[in-house]
A protein has these predicted regions:
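Catalytic cores of alpha/beta
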Residues: 20-37, 81-97, 118-127, 131, ...
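Short secondary-structure boundary/capping elements
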Residues: 27-30, 57, 84-85, 113, ...
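Glycine-rich phosphate-binding active-site loops on the catalytic face of alpha/beta enzymes
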Residues: 37, 41-54, 97-112, 149-172
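Active-site beta-loop-alpha junctions enriched in small/polar residues
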Residues: 13-19, 51-53, 79-81, 105-108, ...
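Glycine/small-residue-rich loop that forms an oxyanion/phosphate-binding "nest" at active or ligand-binding sites
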Residues: 1-62
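Histidine/lysine/aspartate-rich catalytic loop segments that bind and position anionic ligands
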Residues: 71-112
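Glycine-enriched alpha-helix->loop->beta-strand junction motifs that scaffold or abut catalytic
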Residues: 6-9, 42-45, 68-72, 94-101, ...
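Alpha-helix-loop-beta-strand connector modules within alpha/beta enzyme cores
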Residues: 1-18, 57-78, 115-138, 172-184
C-alpha cells in the first residue's frame, strides 16, 4: 500500500527478532523470504544488519543477504553502532558496493563523542556510501548535528510525529519545522 501511495523511495526493515543482531540459519531463511516479499511489492530497498558474537559484521551472512537483495538498494542499519570498531566496519561495508547507505548514531557515548565519530565516518565514507545519521536526532539538535558532522542525510523518528510520540501520526508541520532548521 505504501509503495503505491507515495512517490518517495521506501526501504523495508528486515529484522526477524529484536533481541540481537546475531542471527541463526533459521533467521537467515526468514530474512531471505522477507527480502523476496519486498521485491514483490516493489519497494526501493531493504534495511538490515548482521553481526557475529564478537560484535563484528557477520560477513558470510551479509553476503547471503546481499545476494538475496540483488536489484534492491541496501542500508546497513544501526547494528553498525554495536560494532567494536566503527571505522573497520565502514571499510568492510565499502567493499560491498551493493550497500549504499549506513544508518548510524555514531555508536555509544554523549552527543559530542558521537558527533566526532559521525564526522569521521562522513569524511571517510566520501561518496562511496551514504552515512544516514539517526538515533537521537531531534528537532532540537538536528541543526547542530548537521554542523558538527557535515552530514547530509538524517533519519528522524519520533521528532517527526505528533506529540513526539513514536506511534503518533506523522506531523507535516513538524517536518516543515525540521526542514527549515536544515535550510531545505
Amino acid at each position: 500500500q505504501c509503495v503505491e501511495a507515495v512517490s518517495v523511495p521506501i526501504r523495508v526493515m528486515i529484522r526477524p527478532k529484536s533481541s540481537s543482531f546475531c542471527y541463526s540459519s533459521y533467521d537467515l531463511e526468514v530474512m531471505k523470504y522477507d527480502i523476496e516479499a519486498v521485491k514483490e511489492i516493489g519497494a526501493d530497498g531493504v534495511v538490515f544488519g548482521c553481526l557475529n558474537q564478537s560484535q563484528s559484521i557477520d560477513v558470510k551472512m551479509l553476503e547471503k543477504l546481499l545476494h538475496a537483495s540483488k536489484g534492491l538498494n541496501v542500508t546497513f542499519h544501526r547494528a553498525f553502532d554495536e560494532l567494536t570498531n566503527l571505522e573497520e566496519g565502514l571499510r568492510l561495508i565499502m567493499d560491498y558496493p551493493a550497500i549504499n547507505t549506513i544508518l548510524t548514531s555514531g555508536g555509544y557515548g554523549d552527543l559530542n563523542e558521537r558527533s566526532t565519530r559521525l564526522q569521521q565516518l562522513v569524511r571517510k565514507a566520501d561518496s562511496s556510501v551514504e552515512i544516514l545519521i539517526g538515533g537521537g536526532v531531534t528537532d532540537g539538535n538536528i541543526a547542530s548535528m548537521k554542523s558538527l558532522t557535515n552530514g547530509k542525510s538524517f533519519h528522524i523518528g519520533r521528532s517527526a510525529r505528533e506529540n513526539n510520540d513514536l506511534y503518533g501520526k506523522i506531523s507535516i508541520e513538524q517536518i516543515r519545522h525540521i526542514k527549515n532548521k536544515l535550510g531545505v
